[in-house]
Amino acid sequence: VLAWVRQRAFFSLVAAQFFSSLADSALLIAAIGLLLEQHAAGWMAPALRVFFYFPYLLLAAFAGAVADYFPKGRVMFGTNLVKLGGCALLLAQVHPLFAYGVVGFGAAAYSPAKYGILPELFAPAALVGANAWIEVSTVVSILLGVGLGSFLIAPGSTVPHLLAAPAANATLLISVLYGIAAVFAAAIPHSTARAVVPIAHPWRLLREFRRALCVLWRDPQGQISLAVTSLFWGASATLQFLILSWAAQALGLPLAEAALLQIAVALGMVLGAMAAARWISLHRTLRLLPTGVAIGVAVLLMTLVTQVWVAATLLLVIGVLAGLFIVPMNALLQHRGQALMHAGQTIAVQNFNENMASLAMLAVYGVLLYLDAPISAIVIGFGVFVTLAMLLIVARHGVIRYRLSAVSACGSVR
C-alpha cells in the first residue's frame, strides 16, 4: 500500500510539474507578445526574466518554511493559483512586467515544495532517478511551452479565439494549464513529515534561513554541490541568450532558426539526465566534477564553429554533459539537506544561490552587450569563466578530501 501511495504521489508530482512548467514557458512568449502589442521598449522583454527571478530572492527565507510547514501538495496547489492570478492580471491589462512578476512569486513558493517532497518519497539511493524524472519533465515542458506559446500568438493559428488580441487570447488559454497543474497538485497525498517552523515569526524565519545558508556552505558535500548547481544555473540562464546572439552573428541565422539551437541543448540535457538516472549512483556523484570542466571547454569550442550542423552537435554534447552533471548534484544537495535540515529549507537555499548567480551573470552579460563587446569575446570569456570556476571547485573538493582523510587517519592512530 505504501509503495502504491508513493507511486501515485510521484505521478501526480511529475504531472503537476509538467503542466505548470509548460504554462510558465508558454506564458513568457505570450507576455512578450503583449509587450510587442503595446509597442514597449526593447529592454522590457529580457526584463521579464529578471522580474520572474527576483521573487526567488525575496521569498528565499520564507518559501522553504511554508513548504516544510504545510503539506507540499497543498503548497503546490496554492502556488498554481497564484500563477493563475498572474494570468488574470495580464488579462486585466496590468503591465506585463508586474503581472509576470506575480507568476514569479508563485514559482518561487512552488519550487521548495516540488523538490522538497522527493526526499520524503524516496530513499537516498533512488533520489538520482527521481530527480531525473523531474528534470526531464521540466526540460520537455519548456521545449513544448516555447512552441505552444509561439503557436498561440501566431496570426491565423487554428486555436479558439475567445479574445480578439492574440497575446491576450493565448494568456487565457495558458491559464487552463495552470488549472490542470493545480488539479494534479491537489491529488498528491499529504505527507506525514511536517516540520515545526516559526512560520508566524518572520524575523525568526530570516535567522533560520541564514543558519541554513551557513550550514549548507560549511558542509563538505553541501558546499560543493551548492557551488556547482549555482554555477550551472547561472551559466544556463546566460547561455540561453548567448546562443541566440552567437548564432545570429557567427552563423548568420535568423532568430527563429537560432532558437532551434536551444532545442539541441535541451534534448542533450534530457539524454544526460536519463543516463544519470541509469548509471550514476548518489555516492559516485562527486566523481563527475571534471564533467563541469569539460562543459567550459566545449563552450570555448563554439568560437571555432562555422557550420550549423556542427553547432547543433556541439550544443547537443554540452546539453548531455550538463544533464549528466546537474541531476546527481541536485540529488546530492537534497540528500545532504535532508540530513542537516528540513527539505524545504534546502531547496530555498539552493534557489536563493542559483537565482543570485543567474541575475549576476545576466547582469554582466547585459553590461557587456551595452558596451558593444564582440560576441566571440563574450563566448570566450564565458567559457574561460566556467572552466576556471569548475577547476577551483575541483581543487576545493580535493582539499576537503585531503583534510577529511587526514582527520580519519589521526583518529585511527589514536
Segments the model singles out, each with a brief description of its role:
Residues 11-28, 51-67, 71-83, 99-154, ...:
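Substrate-agnostic recognition of the 12-TM MFS/MFS-like secondary transporter fold
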